[in-house]
Amino acid sequence: GPVAVTFVMDDERLGKYRDRKFTFNGEKRVFHMEAAENAKPADLVIVAVKYNGLESAIDTMSTSVGEDTVIMSVMNGIDSEKKIAARYGWGHTIDAIAQGMDAMRFGDDLTCTHRGQLCIGMEREEQRENLEKVVRFFQEIHMPYTEESDILHRMWAKFMMNVGVNQACAAFETDYAGTLEEGSDANRIMLAAMREVIALANSEGIGLT
């Protein structure tokens, strides 16, 4: 229920969001929010911020991380886990990526028809116990998820798609369908950007093709 989830933030953000009214698919939602200085260690910390807010979030969540806390980033990209592990250790983390959702936000209103799922896994043996804990928890709450045998490949594959599609859409002011038009400049740029990610992934030992 709502009391089982707390949004932890700094004082500035708490003042900004505390009295706002939020809706999900037209239904009012009330979220429990707390200043970081008052937070207690949590069983699971979910990191869901924009990339330029990651370093600040790593500091802000320090009071929420205890001896047995599992930290799960659901951010796009391929290095948020490394940044979190550099501060708190791989023994606190699992790897995760969100996919399949079509959520759109308009101010404080969120809409979606497909909620998607979380792809979760581990890249180091010291993450195994954390992964098992999260799997049991997701099963208990009926959270849609897939346990990936090669989570790094999954993360790099989504990164490749995001880089290719987002760059092409921004450069040519088109949508996803526009990037798929064979022979178009948007399609050419999308594929070129994806090939750059493939080369980078291969250099990191990820068999992306």
Q: For each of these PLM feature ranges, what is it?
A:
Residues 2-42:
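Conserved N-terminal Rossmann-fold NAD(P) cofactor-binding segment
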Residues 9-11, 37-39, 75, 97, ...:
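Residues at the C-termini of beta-strands that transition into short coil/loop
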Residues 25-109:
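Rossmann-like NAD(P)(H) cofactor-binding subdomain of soluble oxidoreductases
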